């Protein structure tokens, strides 16, 4: 007999066995596999003294063990060419294999598993490697692998026979659910007793993220459950019932003769004992109030609410009806859009029906700490707050992962189940295996739809698993799960919501032909215009492709007015898609949807908040949203994209005149005028300057009716500074942004490719020739050709030069120094001009300004600012006095003369 132990001893000899002479033969009964004696010829890959492999090696059937010499296996199977052999690797059910190992066989000395696999090898003429040393009842719940080597048709026969008895696809699943990380320790229980009891009762393995213990800044809410579908569903329900319920309220300041209750108050102790809750008092000295927390279990939620109401009545007496309670929960930031719904429809509906206030953190606010970005607060009456909390839990996403051994199935058939059940299905081919990993994602209140989708994918005849979902999870609209609602759920789960905040970049005629959720960026259009699912997005490639398409479209439009690409990495065939204007791209998270409603392709979180009228264009001026300076490409990634379209903006010569003020005068920002003059087609540029309307009028002077006075060269730095200030503004959720040409030619964009050479004779003087990396703003050149006789100093009025010499903020100062790429560093660290003057070289190093030249410029600027302040405080104010605080470019210079003012940096 060749038992499992003898087989292992043969395949993995120990040092003592290697020292012995080789055995001549083995006596095997006729009923067993006689060909097993030829296994002596198979070389052993285990080194002397290593012994048999560990259980882990046996479970995974490592390629480096008994599969190293494929020639020996081919010789044993009678195959002349080893290349004709085919290898198949797949999972089998662990529990079924354990039962088979424990079973007895009809052959003495062989267990059921040994006889099963030996019989398959003998009848199919294949070689099967299986974990014969599998530990029975091990803590690990992972399914082991089996490998088969042989000819293709024989391997398929052996695989079908093995899976008919040990198939795991109908039983083993992995569920990933969202549970507040603050509740994990409560669910686990003291010494892990609570979670152990759940795992034992449901025969599942529940895993909590290990990183939460070591990472103080980032926490994961994901909990994984592994086991049979019935066990996993039961474990999910028990985990939800085991979560803590924590309700808090503020105790108002009572009269001086009214003592404040505390934990030692007999009534408080009675409530704790009667309702099985824990009452915690937390004082807040700065607010002169006390916070009362009532903590209990979800399975006893009614008792927790009753205890809270009694405490409010006891502590607040006559004003108890006015006291509102708070409940906090953790929802992962990437799930906020799913929970809130399209255009926040779920959130608004819950708040309206429950009369509560639900606060989600602003994910775009860089002042919010990472841990606070998942914290959601619900305020209102006790029962209303609890109902709102339950409905938010019902909208949390749940993912179910399982294997699908048949990789020849039509993927489109599986993907068609998305809108049928309101789920989102993804497929992934497992490495070194012929199985597919299928992920079905849905919301927790509709988890039965996930189970139905799995049942249809696997074509199972077993009864449906009925989930235990509380009635509190459902909203009134959930009763009618129609096609539109299911399609909307699929779009939310896919992560690409087609809403006014995230407009589709495809034309409507084509968007309707793709999928029910039109702007899914996980789809690519092939040459036939059909949508096919793709894998992981590659931001860099799509980013480059995006801008290349912009540049090609720009060149075509300059030469022949050709069509422009839509700029998205959804590649639309030219014959199908109508020409679209390239949208402005803001540099944000790669391949992500954020709260401001942008798809973006970089890591910066800055954006342009305000709407700015465009500059007027002169004849022969080339304008492009992708124009940039050669030097700015090495600076920080800023790309201004305005929030609103420029209404009534004068580009060219036909627009209507009139003033258009900005929406935010309270911010100290005044949007300029966009005047259009019909005669020559030259428009006065619109300027954005800080301050009041008076400063705006004094700054925008008019020199003898010069129609181009708004486009002075000295406005350039100021406009660039204002552009960088605008990019630092926090976006407002819900406001639709449309690209404009307001900042064209300012060199603010560092995300665009180098500009194409200008055509001969096309703004050649202003552009500096084809080799120049600059595209100057419209009207920057002198309209009268006086540059040879009059310098810029003489052409600029004194009051204008004084305005330019005064730096009112850090953005203007850094722009004048040519260090605008450091603006973000100073803004993030909340450094204004007052703090700037106190910085030292060590402080600049700590801020990350490593360039020596940049530090020297900044230190010189600090010294000059301090000198100017000292001079202004000591010298008497006189209109004719000249001191070190004189403005930049003050005085008059002869044509061609060089002036170096005292405060030149």
UniProtKB/Swiss-Prot annotation:
**Which molecular-function annotations from GO does this UniProt entry contain?**
mRNA binding
Record field: compositional bias (Polar residues): 559-569, 630-645
Name its GO BP terms in alphabetical order: actin cytoskeleton organization; follicle cell of egg chamber migration; microtubule cytoskeleton organization; mitotic cell cycle; negative regulation of oskar mRNA translation; oogenesis
Record-listed Phosphotyrosine modification sites: 644, 696
Show the Pfam families listed in the entry. KH_1 (PF00013), KH_BICC1 (PF22985), KH_BICC1_1st (PF24234), SAM_1 (PF00536)
For bias kind Gly residues, which ranges apply? 646-660
| Annotated InterPro entries | BICC1_KH, BICC1_KH-I_rpt1, BICC1_KH-I_rpt2, BICC1_KH-I_rpt3, BICC1_SAM_dom, KH_dom, KH_dom_type_1, KH_dom_type_1_sf
Q: What name does the UniProt record give this protein?
A: Protein bicaudal C
Organism of provenance? Drosophila melanogaster
Lineage at the top is:
Eukaryota, Metazoa, Ecdysozoa, Arthropoda, Hexapoda
